[in-house]
């Protein structure tokens, strides 16, 4: 184990893409998602050379944007509720209808803010005022390539209501307006249990005061 100073520490990760040798790649499935199988070798820690050849499967999908609509005047957030097939497949007792932040895939030529504004209209019937980035992260890098960019958008929460979604995509999405304090309790209680929403709401819990000051 290496101990690092608390201030001014750059990333301790030294290996790069050049330290991976891809010896083979094939597409196993191509539909809404693409599934690929890689054969590869990679550099080992402690100067122990290269690994044996290993096989790794990866799910390929477009990168996406998550949006947390926030009303700084009312101190409320807008969430959506919809059926999620992954939650259904998880075979849990919990409902497969999840409370989530708004989200959508990035189309060719779009930037994250454009996606956030489009999805806010499509999924919640709301218009964003100011919008800013929170962070971005790899959703599940052990088996998927997707990077999710999370944004927070200023809204008038009194305009958020009803059921929305695109008919051609068979979306059926219900809108919820909830106080910031309540959604933070829901995160702690496990009512909200999907990663993008938890990350966005924890960010808001840390930064809401600064955000109110920025957007006043």
Name each model feature, range by range.
Residues 1-24, 29-32:
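Alpha-helical and coiled-coil interaction segments, frequently adjacent to or embedded
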Residues 2-5, 56-61, 73-118, 167-169, ...:
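Conserved Nudix-box catalytic region and its N-terminal flanking loop in Nudix hydrolases
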Residues 44, 53-54, 63-66, 102-195, ...:
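Unchanged
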Residues 197-207:
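Buried hydrophobic packing segments
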Residues 28-74, 82, 88:
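Acidic, metal-coordinating catalytic segment for phosphate/diphosphate chemistry
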Residues 205-216:
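Short helix-capping/linker segments at secondary-structure and domain boundaries
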Residues 30-32, 59, 93-95, 143-145:
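A generic structural micro-feature
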């Amino acid at each position: 184990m290496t101990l690092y100073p608390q201030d001014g520490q750059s990333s301790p990760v030294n290996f790069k893409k050049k330290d991976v040798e891809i010896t083979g790649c094939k597409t196993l499935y191509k539909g809404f998602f693409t599934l690929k199988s890689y054969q590869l070798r990679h550099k080992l820690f402690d100067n122990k050379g290269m690994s044996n050849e290993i096989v790794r499967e990866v799910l390929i999908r477009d990168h996406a944007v998550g949006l947390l609509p926030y009303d700084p005047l009312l101190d409320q957030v807008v969430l959506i509720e919809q059926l999620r097939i992954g939650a259904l497949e998880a075979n849990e007792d919990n409902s497969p209808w999840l409370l989530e932040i708004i989200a959508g895939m990035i189309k060719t030529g779009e930037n994250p803010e454009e996606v956030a504004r489009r999805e806010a209209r499509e999924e919640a019937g709301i218009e964003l005022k100011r919008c800013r980035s929170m962070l971005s992260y790899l959703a599940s890098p052990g088996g998927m390539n997707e990077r999710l960019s999370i944004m927070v958008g200023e809204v008038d929460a009194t305009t958020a209501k009803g059921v929305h979604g695109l008919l051609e995509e068979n979306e059926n999405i219900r809108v919820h307006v909830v106080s910031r304090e309540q959604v933070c309790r829901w995160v702690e209680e496990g009512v909200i249990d999907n990663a993008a929403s938890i990350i966005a709401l924890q960010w808001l819990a840390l930064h809401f005061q600064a955000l109110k000051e920025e957007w006043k």
